[in-house]
Amino acid sequence: MLKRLCTILAASALAAPLALGIARANGTEELTPYKMIRSLQYVQDSVVLGDHSAIEMQRFMLGAIDERLRAADHSAFRDPRNVDAALVYVMSGGNPATLDLLADRDIEGNFDSRVTDALRQYLNGKGPLIVENLTKAAPEYKNSRIGPYLFLILGNAMSQQDPIEAMKHYDWARLTAPGTIIEEAALRRSVSLAAQAGLPEKGFRYALNYARRYLTSPFASQFADVFVELAVAHFDEAADGRVSEILSFMDSARQREVYLRVARRAAIAGNQALARLASRRAEELAGDDSSRSQVLASFYEGLAAVPSADVFSAAEALEAIPDEKLSPRDRALREAAKAVADAVVRPPLGESPAQAPAPIAERPAGEQSELAAEESGSGMSPFGQPVEASPGRPSEMTAEADVAASDDPALDGFLASGRSKIDEIDALLKGEGQ
């Protein structure tokens, strides 16, 4: 009886402030912006910690705060907490036009023009232009309410120019805002930058921290993309142990998905050993639960085997997989693999020295554009970068042309055919990423 009475009293104590708040909201008193922004921060942090039902509340809160900021009298922003609330709002997915309105109406100088100008440029897609000015202004806000947000924005703005320095800004942002959407974003983006900068140990450390805390985030799929990029680019015996440690925080279905992504990326990159290893681990995790996962694992293992001595068996295995079991992107991969297999097993053109190479059928222009659009769609990693030509490629092509300019017409024809086949494969794989 006493226990039940204590429970009732505790519930009453918690309900009283909520009821009072609702009564005030329905009355003449309006919530100030800084109080509303606290609720938004709580909701956003709940989302990345796994409460996906709060996503709709986040949208509602953003709309309500937008209306409140636009309706606020300019005197409200004499309180620095409301100024910070307006800045946090726009850095949390709010309406950029609201910041424009508030900055233009600020006749008392309540807003720091260095910060508002930088944010307005950043939100208009001009991130690289703000680096110099925000680098000077941000340290003044290190210990303020907006500090973690500014350092996250600064890291984003300079990530392509200086990924190592950007990671330092991400470190500061996440360490001053643990357990928040700021830390989640900073860790996820740091994994991508570490992969780009060739710092695998640092990248795996970021990935481990992310896996421990944020696997239930709605952005975890983006993390999986950049983690796969890191694992494939820097895989060795030591990395294998780190990958296994990070995946241990995932359930079997997520582990299988990651291994399938690793197998696919490794097969495209020509890393046969890794593609086979990841495919076999995905098959082991699939068991009897997912026939499609087993098919994909076998498919990626077959892709990896195409350039090997077992090319005939690999080509037959790939051909045996039904089209409906593969996505359009994987069907394009299979076409490329078949083209490679045909080039490997085709005998040299030695019957007639003057025989011209057979023409290679090209895809219609419309079909190629459709494939390119599909390959660059939502299935690609948001952090993926377009494939860039290797600096050494022109000299390689020049050397190849020198060899081709020999006195052997059969060799000329074989090399010309090979170059045409490579061009065809490149077209099929366009948009796949590295």
Curated annotation (Swiss-Prot):
Keywords: Chemotaxis, Flagellar rotation, Periplasm, Signal. The keyword Signal applies. Residues 344-417 are annotated as: Disordered. It is found in: Periplasm. One of its GO terms (cellular component) is periplasmic space. The lineage of its organism: Bacteria, Pseudomonadati, Pseudomonadota, Alphaproteobacteria, Hyphomicrobiales. Residues 1-15 form the signal peptide. This is Chemotaxis protein MotC.
